[in-house]
Regions:
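Terminal low-complexity/charged segments
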Residues: 1-158
Length: 158
């Protein structure tokens, strides 16, 4: 098998299976595949990857690209990592949940809500994570434009 044959096969299969819903697919190095998916197709793509043996969701990484927010979903077969990017407009940031495919995504998706202000459709109600329940709900610490605003009864030096 060629050095990147497995990775190229995964990339091609993703493109073939999902057509125009997958873009910017690439193999940048051994054991790594990257692709961007249309937001609405995220759960379907993740279900397909799981069925193909990528049945461990290693983590989810949120991002802020200015006009867009989103997340990378990193799934693995314990050798190769497939990194799926889904983005959403900053003005109305919404991503579909992948909990029906990967129940372990719960804390990762709650983190997208707390830290980036992304609404995750299908996320069940529950406690905030990782921020405390009394943290202001209109502040998103991992957005590039976030500025800490201390509560009225506190200062930054406290």
């Amino acid at each position: 098998m060629g050095e990147l044959e497995k990775e190229e096969r995964i990339k091609s299969a993703l493109e073939k299976q999902f057509g125009g819903a997958v873009s910017n697919a690439s193999v940048q190095r051994r054991n790594r595949v990257w692709a961007e998916v249309e937001t609405a197709k995220l759960p379907e793509v993740m279900a397909w990857l799981k069925a193909e043996g990528f049945n461990h969701l290693a983590t989810v990484s949120g991002f802020d690209e200015g006009e867009n927010l989103g997340a990378y979903y990193h799934t693995t077969d314990f050798k190769t990592v497939v990194n799926i990017k889904a983005k959403t407009p900053r003005a109305n940031p919404v991503l579909p949940s992948v909990l029906s495919v990967f129940p372990g995504a719960l804390s990762y998706e709650r983190e997208l809500v707390d830290m980036f202000g992304i609404k995750v459709q299908g996320l069940p109600p529950g406690r905030r994570y990782p921020l405390p329940d009394d943290f202001p709900t209109d502040q998103y610490p991992l957005r590039k434009d976030w500025k800490f605003v201390p509560p009225a009864n506190e200062t930054e030096a406290d």
